[in-house]
Amino acid sequence: MLSLSKNWNALIKTDKVSYESFHETNNKSKIIVEPLERGFGLTLGNAMRRVLLSSLQGAAVTSIKIPGIEHEFSSIPGVKEDISEIILNVKGIEIKMHVAEKRVIRLKATGPGAITAGMIEAGHDVEILNPDHVICNLAKNKQFEMELTCKVGKGYTLSTNNNEDNNLPIGEIAIDALFNPVKSVTYKVENTRIGQVTDYDKLIMFVETNGDILPEMAVGLAARILQEQLQLFISFEEQEEDKQVKTDALPFSPYLLKRVDELELSVRSANCLKNDNIIYIGDLVKRTEADMLRTPNFGRKSLNEIKEILAKFSLRFGMDVPDWPPENIHELSKRYEDSYN
């Protein structure tokens, strides 16, 4: 019977996920995943983007209360913006909550000038992430007060959903709330190569958050959500031989058991390794670059070719491999074949 695990172990795997921050606050990151099977860049990129933009927990202002104001169609003398504009500006306040329960924070200010989110008395449980965000503009000597109710939630909710059973007190105005800490997600898929095969996928994602969590954490949470949802579809038990490969621990990466003649090297590089009796990747990575360059007919071009391939497996020249070579290397290579093919 065909091993069930071949369905997933036969696919190329990567342990290489790189994160590159390109903003001084670390709120923007470039995430690169490679190599992936053809088509998986688009599959994973689209799924991750949808989850990142819809399903993460965050905090937001869900209602406001301004003395003397009963609804959003009002205006306040001495305040440049009407209530509808103030509500739009309040929706742009980005917050982080350190507790799960709702909190009420307060704003008291006197004109003239712009009133910003940083003037809010947030206390210890709520943190304002964009303190320079303008809420309204006041005339000279104009006093302005407002209470803001903050809650933890998911995604985007309308004001009608934030009015708990229509039980908000008179004068408290429910507003739309964007809880999601992820502000934007874009991705693109490029070709990458392993040896002579050039049509593997490279997934490049650009993720920006509001500072509540780092992009790396957001990506991890999105992947965990997908994992939890997809688990429902796994309705079979793994075969014993599949479990055996998983539970028998190796003191080194199973990739080291892969034969070098399976790497699709150039003819020159492959012949040099064969003539030097280098059979497995484990034999190869124990050599230093200097050792390799002393190999007859092996030049810098061949060295760079092999270094690039090893990097795909998170390997390099000059590695210290414990217990290499194992006595039963041929048997182990067969047993772990699904792990690296």
From Swiss-Prot:
Pfam short name (any one): RNA_pol_A_bac
Signal peptide limits: none
Transcription in keyword set: yes
MF (Gene Ontology): DNA binding; DNA-directed RNA polymerase activity; protein dimerization activity
Coiled-coil segments on the chain, per record: none
GO cellular component, one term: DNA-directed RNA polymerase complex
Lineage top rank: taxon: Bacteria
Name of the top EC class for this enzyme: transferase
Any GO BP: DNA-templated transcription
Keyword Iron-sulfur recorded: no
Cited InterPro entries: DNA-dir_RNA_pol_insert, DNA-dir_RNA_pol_RpoA/D/Rpb3, DNA-dir_RpoA, RBP11-like, RNAP_asu_C, RNApol_insert_sf
Region (Alpha C-terminal domain (alpha-CTD)) location: 252-341
Chain positions covered by the region annotation Alpha N-terminal domain (alpha-NTD): 1-237
UniProt cross-references to NCBIfam families, sorted A to Z: PRK05182.1-2 (NF003513), PRK05182.2-5 (NF003519), rpoA (TIGR02027)
Similarity comment: family membership: Belongs to the RNA polymerase alpha chain family.
Record's subunit section: Homodimer. The RNAP catalytic core consists of 2 alpha, 1 beta, 1 beta' and 1 omega subunit. When a sigma factor is associated with the core the holoenzyme is formed, which can initiate transcription.
HAMAP family in the record: RNApol_bact_RpoA (MF_00059)
Domain comment as written in the entry: The N-terminal domain is essential for RNAP assembly and basal transcription, whereas the C-terminal domain is involved in interaction with transcriptional regulators and with upstream promoter elements.
Protein role: DNA-dependent RNA polymerase catalyzes the transcription of DNA into RNA using the four ribonucleoside triphosphates as substrates.
Protein name (Swiss-Prot/TrEMBL): DNA-directed RNA polymerase subunit alpha
Name of the gene: rpoA
